[in-house]
């Protein structure tokens, strides 16, 4: 059985996207065309709170910052799964409880592995 798709219902969404995109492009273009363009060395220099720049703004970051960021995202997503599970725990019963405990055990094993490998050590 085929479900009839009424494309006319999506017309307001299409108009919203077209008008929003057109307005954004128009405003950026008008600012680029009419705005003054007088670059000099002071305008192109990186700004550091009113002080003279101590070093080049394009310095390299340590890889450990990226590792901490990735670990934060992973465990933040775990928390995002825990909140709805806690709210719906009475409705999903034992199968939902057991599946979430397996999920948490996998994350706990991953955390222990990261800790044992020294991924959380900063020295």
Curated annotation (Swiss-Prot):
GO molecular function: NADH dehydrogenase (ubiquinone) activity; NADH:ubiquinone reductase (non-electrogenic) activity; quinone binding
Keywords linked to the UniProt accession: Cell inner membrane, Cell membrane, Membrane, NAD, Quinone, Translocase, Transmembrane, Transmembrane helix, Transport, Ubiquinone
Localization per record: Cell inner membrane
Primary site of residence: membrane
Pfam families named in the record: Oxidored_q4 (PF00507)
Catalytic reaction list: a quinone + NADH + 5 H(+)(in) = a quinol + NAD(+) + 4 H(+)(out)
Family of the protein in this entry: Belongs to the complex I subunit 3 family.
HAMAP family assigned to the protein according to its UniProt record, in alphabetical order: NDH1_NuoA
Function: NDH-1 shuttles electrons from NADH, via FMN and iron-sulfur (Fe-S) centers, to quinones in the respiratory chain. The immediate electron acceptor for the enzyme in this species is believed to be ubiquinone. Couples the redox reaction to proton translocation (for every two electrons transferred, four hydrogen ions are translocated across the cytoplasmic membrane), and thus conserves the redox energy in a proton gradient.
Protein name: NADH-quinone oxidoreductase subunit A
Gene that specifies this protein: nuoA
């Amino acid at each position: 059985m085929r479900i009839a798709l009424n494309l006319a219902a999506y017309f307001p969404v299409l108009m919203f996207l077209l008008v929003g995109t057109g307005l954004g492009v128009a405003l950026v273009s008008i600012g680029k065309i009419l705005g003054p363009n007088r670059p000099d060395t002071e305008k192109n220099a990186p700004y550091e709170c009113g002080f003279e720049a101590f070093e080049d703004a394009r310095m390299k970051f340590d890889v450990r910052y990226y590792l901490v960021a990735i670990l934060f995202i992973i465990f933040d997503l775990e928390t995002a799964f825990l909140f709805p599970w806690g709210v719906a725990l009475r409705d999903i019963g034992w199968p939902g409880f057991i599946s979430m405990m397996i999920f948490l055990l996998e994350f706990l094993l991953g955390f222990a592995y990261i800790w044992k490998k020294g991924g959380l050590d900063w020295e």
